[in-house]
């Protein structure tokens, strides 16, 4: 676990992807409920 540094790339990726999915799903949910 000393030379294997995949978490250093994985942590920001997950940190960016998770909020993006959350915001996208929330946005789609609002768009589906409010048909303007």
Curated annotation (Swiss-Prot):
Q: What is its main location?
A: plastid
Q: Which InterPro entries match?
A: PSI_PsaI, PSI_PsaI_sf
Report the superkingdom from the record.
Eukaryota
The answer to keyword Transmembrane helix applying to this record is: yes
Which is a GO BP term held by this UniProt record? Answer: photosynthesis
Q: Where are the transmembrane segments?
A: 8-28
Keyword list, A-Z: Chloroplast, Membrane, Photosynthesis, Photosystem I, Plastid, Thylakoid, Transmembrane, Transmembrane helix
All disulfide bonds of the chain are none
Q: Where in the cell is it found?
A: Plastid, Chloroplast thylakoid membrane
**Membrane topology of the entry:** Single-pass membrane protein
Assigned GO CC terms = chloroplast thylakoid membrane; photosystem I
As for what it does, the entry says: May help in the organization of the PsaL subunit.
* Family stated for the protein in its record: Belongs to the PsaI family.
Q: What is this protein called?
A: Photosystem I reaction center subunit VIII
Q: Which organism is it from?
A: Jasminum nudiflorum (Winter jasmine)
Q: Which gene encodes it?
A: psaI
């Amino acid at each position: 676990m000393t030379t294997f540094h995949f978490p250093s790339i994985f942590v920001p990726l997950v940190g960016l992807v998770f909020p993006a999915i959350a915001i996208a799903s929330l946005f789609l949910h609002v768009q589906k409920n409010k048909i303007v």
